[in-house]
Amino acid sequence: MEYTKKIVYQSNYWYNDGLRKAKIRDMSGAIMSLRKSLQFNRENIAARNLLGLVYYGIGEVPEALVEWIISKNLKSRDNIADYYIKNV
C-alpha cells in the first residue's frame, strides 16, 4: 500500500508542476511534467486532459485528440474530455 501511495503522490506532484507551467505558458515544460506524471500513473485523468489542452494550445490537435480519447476510454462518464473532443 505504501508503494502505491508514493506512486500516486509522484504523479500528482508532476501534474501540479505541469499545471503551474501551463499557467505561465511554459508549454514545453508543462508537456514534460505532464508526461512524467503519466509515467507514474497512466490513469491520471486530470494530467491526461491537461496534456491534451497543452497540445491543443500549441496547435498539435492530433496529439490533443489522442490524449482526450485515451482519457475518455479510461473514464467514460463525467469526463471533460468528451466536451473537448466534441468542440475540436
Where are these regions (language model features)?
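Conserved structural position within tetratricopeptide repeats
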Residues: 5, 35-39, 70-73
